[in-house]
Amino acid sequence: MKFCPKCGSMMMPRKENGKTVYKCSKCGYIDTENQKEAKITTVIKHSAKEKTLVLESDMPKTGVQLTRGISCPSCGNDEAYFWILQTRSADEPATRFYKCTKCGKVWREYE
């Protein structure tokens, strides 16, 4: 890890003109010294049981949970993500949305 000598921000290794250099994301300063030390590595590991949820524009960014025992009307899968939104007036119950983990179908359930 390196810090920018001009502004003190953390510098990140980047590819510039085919070479790996440290570049400050705040002020743009480029450190060309010690290029051999700069290394860009991306490692993504997932266990067999772990799932990655990709939130799409039709899903809220918080409050998403996984549930089992709800049958998808499209493919019959029994696992879905769900979230709750207040879609009607405040004196009405909230609406629960589901998204199938297998086919991606989104459906709603009124309480």
UniProtKB/Swiss-Prot annotation:
Per the UniProt entry, what is one GO biological process?
A: DNA-templated transcription
SUPFAM superfamilies for this protein: Zinc beta-ribbon
Zinc fingers (TFIIS-type): give the ranges. Answer: 68-108
Give the ZnF (C4-type) ranges: 4-27
Q: Which InterPro entries match?
A: DNA-dir_RNA_pol-M_15_CS (IPR019761), Rpa12/Rpb9/Rpc10/TFS (IPR012164), TFS (IPR006288), Zn_ribbon_RPB9 (IPR001529), Znf_TFIIS (IPR001222)
Q: Which GO terms describe its cellular component?
A: DNA-directed RNA polymerase complex
Q: Which residues bind Zn(2+) 2?
A: C72, C75, C100, C103
Cited Pfam families: Zn_ribbon_RPB9, Zn_ribbon_TFIIS
One example of the protein's molecular function in GO is: zinc ion binding
Concerning its family, UniProt says: Belongs to the archaeal RpoM/eukaryotic RPA12/RPB9/RPC11 RNA polymerase family.
Could you identify this protein by its name?
Transcription factor S
Q: Which organism is it from?
A: Sulfolobus acidocaldarius (strain ATCC 33909 / DSM 639 / JCM 8929 / NBRC 15157 / NCIMB 11770)
Tell me the organism's taxonomic lineage. Answer: Archaea, Thermoproteota, Thermoprotei, Sulfolobales, Sulfolobaceae
> What is the name of the gene encoding this protein?
tfs
